[in-house]
Amino acid sequence: MSLRRAKSLPSLKNIAEVAKPITKAPPLPLLAFEGPGLSTCRWYPTTVRTVHNTPSKAQTTLLSTAKKESAFSAMNLKALRNECRSRGLQVSGRKSDLIERIVDFELKGPLGRRGTRRAFHSPGTSSASVCRPVDKVTMPDIALTERAVQQPEKNYILRIPSLSREAASHPVTKSEKDLAQGADEDADPTSEEGRVLTPDSDLHIESPVVINKIEIINEDDYLQDDSRQSSDSQGGSQQDSDGTGQQNFSPRDRRFFAGLTAAVGLWWYFGNKSAKRRMRK
């Protein structure tokens, strides 16, 4: 028998599939949301199978970072800084430092974190993790805000009482009460005839005035008293006239009139002398 050609021989891939068939991994389950919205979610543990097409003469990219370093080394410094900024890494440093940070971040990516997280749990148990929703954005109620602005504030710091005419008549403080009590004690309730004073000045009670007065008068005593009063009145009027005559001129007026009379007397005296001298001549 002649040997078959190499092309007719089954490939190594077919041999491997026959020896160990490839089992397809089940699809990833969807998130099971519980409650209103995205409040809680559960992650079910599943096995993840990844297929890599690696050349026979090249090393796998999972164990070496040469391919990634070559991809980032082709970038300039500005692009590397943008990559670090997008990943939340430190931006300062040289180009080699930036490449190392990015490569370390890629190696510690979500696959590594997911594998370390699932290693602590058994495949039969389920771990529940709380998923925080996106920040809620609430629009303010403009109508309610305008209504609140238009209404006056109810909690005032200082309460101003309303104006009233009775505010001054009612004493409130201790000093006002003391003054009102002192004024009531000093006031004579019989100061006005025919009126009874009360603490409230607006209210007064008028008493009847005594019109008919009954008196017993002695005629002799009445005449003597009348004559005595007339004589006293005449004497008083004379004294008043003398006093008023003396008191009509003030001391200044008296000096003025005295000086005037003295000047007139001197003028008359010297005028007569000059006239006599002329007569003699």
UniProtKB/Swiss-Prot annotation:
Specify the SAP domain's residue ranges: 72-106
Q: Where in the cell is it found?
A: Mitochondrion membrane
The protein's UniProt keywords, in alphabetical order, are: Membrane, Mitochondrion, Transit peptide, Transmembrane, Transmembrane helix
- So where does this one cross the membrane? 255-272
User: What InterPro entries does this protein's entry cite?
Assistant: SAP_dom (IPR003034), SAP_dom_sf (IPR036361)
One GO CC annotation: mitochondrial membrane
Q: Short name of one Pfam family for this protein? A: SAP
Low complexity bias: start-end ranges: 230-247
* Keyword Kinase found: no
Q: How does it sit in the membrane?
A: Single-pass membrane protein
Question: Region labeled Disordered — which residues?
Answer: 166-202, 221-253
What is the similarity comment for this entry?
Belongs to the AIM34 family.
Identify this protein by name: Altered inheritance of mitochondria protein 34, mitochondrial
